[in-house]
Amino acid sequence: MKHTLNLATALAVGLMPIAAGAQSMSPMRGEVNSFTDAFAVRVFPANPYGQKIKVEIHVYDQNFQPVDAKISPNVFQLGSQASRPVLVVVPFGGAAERKVRICTESIPFPNQQTQIKAQICGKFFGHRKS
């Protein structure tokens, strides 16, 4: 029994760094004032994993419907323990305000054992000033 408990404890401690390291993006929320027909946000997707991942950036409205935003770059590979800036330009579409979700999605590489698609989204609020 004591041996089983020690083994379970060792496994739990050994797996903690795996569970703690999760795909991330910063910032996760923000408000932007703009004097033009669009507002811009710079986000930083990060890869905490030990191998590279393929990343796609998408922009959605509050109901998770796609928004026609300009994203540069929108698809890229992110190395292990790396982060990179991504510029997102969101049109107001004639409105004075716009709430969007900017999402980082990791895409599994083909022929790999794990085929999980992870998504993390931040909330951003644009205000058009006149």
Which residues are covered by each model-predicted region?
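N-terminal signal peptide c-region/cleavage motif recognized by signal peptidases
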Residues: 17-19
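Boundary of Sec targeting at the N-terminus
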Residues: 22-25
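Bacterial N-terminal signal peptides that target proteins for export
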Residues: 1-8
